[in-house]
């Protein structure tokens, strides 16, 4: 939890490495009735056709990232650029992160009277968004599992998958920054009892 005034609202920051299982935990939290604000969704919307950020990306990369016969961005082509060039990744993050932060502020205002909300943010620590959260849950798995899951999920080569993992802070660095670590090393859904106990906790317990 970031230092400062205590929140009147429980704000669960849900993060973890790529392919660690954040989305599964996020879907489960939504099934428990919590609004889930999704940074990835906000980022996708920011790069929709006609948006200012989309125009900036098109101006920088041109037809290389333009989906055939449309004004949309070919996200796979953009990924091949930014996950293999740290300077280009930083440029894109500097473009998108302020937009995502603004969308979170807007969404949190809409949910101001909701007792608890979830902020699902893959790059929570990298983007410095800890101050939005009253507590942070890290969905954790072994690095080897992370690689295997990413290759299977996205059909990537091992090299391409490693590049995407390397673009984020390592899980062992994030473990020490989270308030709670949700273990996702076992079979699918093995994390649910732990998540259920965390959800039942007082928002201020152990923080």
UniProtKB/Swiss-Prot annotation:
Keyword set includes Cytoplasm: yes
Disulfide bonds: none
Protein name from the UniProt record: Dephospho-CoA kinase
Keywords: ATP-binding, Coenzyme A biosynthesis, Cytoplasm, Kinase, Nucleotide-binding, Transferase
GO molecular-function terms, A-Z: ATP binding; dephospho-CoA kinase activity
The protein's role, per its UniProt record: Catalyzes the phosphorylation of the 3'-hydroxyl group of dephosphocoenzyme A to form coenzyme A.
Alphabetical list of InterPro entries matching this protein: Depp_CoAkinase (IPR001977), P-loop_NTPase (IPR027417)
Enzyme class per UniProt: transferase
Species assigned in the record: Synechococcus sp. (strain CC9605)
Subcellular location as annotated: Cytoplasm
Family: Belongs to the CoaE family.
Superkingdom per UniProt: Bacteria
Record-level GO cellular component terms: cytoplasm
Pathway: Cofactor biosynthesis; coenzyme A biosynthesis; CoA from (R)-pantothenate: step 5/5
Chief place where the protein resides: cytoplasm
Annotated positions binding ATP: 19-24
């Amino acid at each position: 939890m970031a230092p400062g005034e205590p929140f009147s609202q429980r704000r669960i920051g849900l993060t973890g490495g790529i392919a660690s299982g954040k989305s599964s935990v996020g879907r489960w939290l939504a099934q428990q009735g919590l609004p889930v604000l999704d940074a990835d969704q906000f980022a996708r919307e920011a790069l929709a056709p006609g948006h200012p950020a989309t125009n900036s990306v098109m101006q920088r990369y041109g037809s290389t990232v333009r989906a055939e016969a449309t004004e949309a961005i070919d996200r796979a082509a953009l990924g091949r650029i930014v996950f293999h060039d740290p300077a280009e990744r930083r440029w894109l993050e500097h473009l998108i992160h302020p937009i995502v932060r603004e969308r979170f502020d807007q969404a949190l205002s809409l949910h101001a009277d909701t007792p608890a909300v979830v902020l699902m943010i893959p790059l929570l620590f990298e983007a410095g968004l800890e101050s939005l959260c009253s507590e942070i849950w890290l969905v954790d798995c072994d690095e080897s599992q992370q690689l295997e899951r990413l290759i299977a999920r996205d059909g990537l080569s091992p090299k391409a998958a490693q590049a995407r993992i390397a673009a984020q802070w390592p899980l062992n660095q994030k473990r020490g920054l989270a308030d709670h670590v949700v273990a996702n090393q076992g079979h699918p859904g093995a994390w649910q009892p732990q998540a259920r106990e965390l959800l039942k906790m007082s928002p201020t317990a152990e923080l």
